[in-house]
Amino acid sequence: VQCANRNFVALLKQITPSLVLIDGLYGMEGKGPIKGSPVFHGFAVASEDAVAADALATHVMGFNPDDVPYLELAFHAGLGNNRWQNVIGIDPQTVKFPYRPHPLFQRQRKYRERLRPAGPVPQAPASPPLHEGNPEAKD
């Protein structure tokens, strides 16, 4: 768990995308990404901030972005915002759908707790607008 989260952040340090697209037409729950169960979800996210895009997708999947260690690590490394603001499109709450977590999710939450700094949590700076929506929705 620790290695994967740190590797995600190391990769983001090396490759800084100028645009992130998340195709959420289908997701995977449970033992993903290989042995999970596919779920039709029907949403998409586009952002200039990879961390904010993942935080929004995490929220839409019914998880708390604060429980995902790489989002916290990336935020503290200055690689992006682990909050989303300025969502353009439909309200994320309208496409929120709870996914079954991976069996190792609780271990990841414990690792995340060890990362949490003592004292007040710093406020995230404003992100560029996130474009999120349902591919079947009309503008």
Residue ranges and their predicted role:
Residues 1-139:
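Extended, low-polarity segments enriched in aliphatic/aromatic residues
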